[in-house]
Amino acid sequence: MITRLSELFLRTLREDPADAEVPSHKLLVRAGYVRRVAPGVYTWLPLGLRAMRKIEDVIRQEMNAIGGQEMLFPALLPREPYEESNRWTEYGDNLFRLKDRKGADMLLGPTHEEMFTTAVKDMYSSYKDFPVTLYQIQTKYRDEERPRAGVLRGREFTMKDSYSFDMTDEGLDESYARHRKAYQNIFDRLEIDYAICKATSGAMGGSASEEFLAVSEVGEDTFVRATEGEYAANVEAVVTQAPEEISFEGLPEAQEHETPKSETIESLVEWAKGAGITVDGREVTAADTLKCMMIKVAAPAATEEEKEWELAAVLIPGDRALDEKRLEASLEPAEFELAGEGDFKKNSFLVKGYVGPRVLNAHDVKVYADPRVVSGTSWITGADAPQRHVVGLVAGRDFTVDEFIEAAEVKEGDPAPNGQGTLTLERGIELGHIFQLGRKYTEAFDVQILDENGKRAVPTMGSYGIGVTRMLAVLAEQRHDEKGLNWPVAVAPYQVHVAVANKDAAALEAGQKLVEDLDRAGIEVLYDDRPKVSPGVKFKDAELLGMPFIAILGRAFADGIIELRIRGGETREVPADSIVDTLTELIRG
């Protein structure tokens, strides 16, 4: 295939767009791959669409290889199936809702578990029909509160979502393993640097859950890896190793103290040191103090007006910050907000900066706590009065915890949950997520299948998603330099970019012959045949657009030499009569 730049619908930009924050956003816009329509909504221009179709082709090949069958559901969906699964409310404001002319509630699909489940229910009735794996590649819609980073986090995006249906849990394990391997094949073929991380299931529900995270400094997700072994997890899924419970016997009674100028953990620790207070014979540290973070929690609701907020508290050691993403994952599907001034005024028993767990118990405020706050541990915390703290407040004796959750930050150097080494922190971008959903949706939709004994049984499900548009942005993030994009062969819109920098007739004729020879060899060619564009502009555009191989017919062509630039790598001088063979060999790897 030959595409001429003189005919391609394309305009490159020399300056970064004003609203672009990350390299992928800047370069995809500058190189003419995408164009912004509205916040989080983008047009895919010819080059961008070709690259995205290449990614889809790789996904289809690997999905078909594990027995997946492609289908396509509508994006416009009725309310009722999502009402049955409770996700009409669980998705909250992230759901695009609308009404048709008859007043019926509709939505733009954020994901399609409900539709796949009802399709299987309506069409299959015997165990002989199973197992089955179905998938689609389709546009999804989520009303992100803060769309950012171009197509990395948009409100409209393309996903591959697949679903396995098995009659047994062992069958689900096999389907999950096949998908896991298929995902590894996809990311390996696309040359993405990624990590497979233990994850939470969130609103999707289910048990086993893993994320495929692309390693990137601009990633919104933090993940950890153990310095030894193969443990890796999204920070939201890291499980704190709780200490052993301690006997209350022999522990001194809690004592209140005046603590002037102790509004922060740092100043409280300094006060304790100055007062000569020790813990097991050592100086007090921030880890001996206990923060009481006030929050509000509400069950999911379709609108803000329907939410019923309840006061709650989160107790975490003073040497840790509150990690709102971990807290959100722990509370899902419920939502939370940090308590504001109005909440403190409304609940006069709360003394801001000096809240302690005793007053929370006394007023029936739900208390969540970090797993380190086990029974028998002793803490320095607020005494529910200005400039006062209590020393030696013992969990389980002086206050109680309603529920232990993961809400404290994970730190570099924390012990690895697998017991092998310590944790290192990295940033990543979620590309894929696989879940063992179990029977959450098949039970919700009363999917009844006759098993081999003629008895009714409920099949079990797996859910597997890949962000197609996000994958393109990730490749732009991971594979670029100061000159522009640098696509792998499997994704590049064209495999070879040919530019004629010498304007004499012989070079122009040779350029035409070269692209025709490349086309006959089955190589996809982008041909810069623009007659009134300088060689310098052609070179800059070639590097910006990012095709893996750039063939230049320049001054050396008079001696029968074509300059071959391997994008992001070496430059070779190749005899014109062997350039097609050289490129064919390079493309085949």
From Swiss-Prot:
Its EC number is 6.1.1.15. It is found in: Cytoplasm. Transmembrane segments: none annotated. Pfam families: HGTP_anticodon (PF03129), tRNA-synt_2b (PF00587), tRNA_edit (PF04073). GO terms for cellular component: cytosol. Catalyzes the attachment of proline to tRNA(Pro) in a two-step reaction: proline is first activated by ATP to form Pro-AMP and then transferred to the acceptor end of tRNA(Pro). As ProRS can inadvertently accommodate and process non-cognate amino acids such as alanine and cysteine, to avoid such errors it has two additional distinct editing activities against alanine. One activity is designated as 'pretransfer' editing and involves the tRNA(Pro)-independent hydrolysis of activated Ala-AMP. Homodimer. Belongs to the class-II aminoacyl-tRNA synthetase family. ProS type 1 subfamily. This is Proline--tRNA ligase.
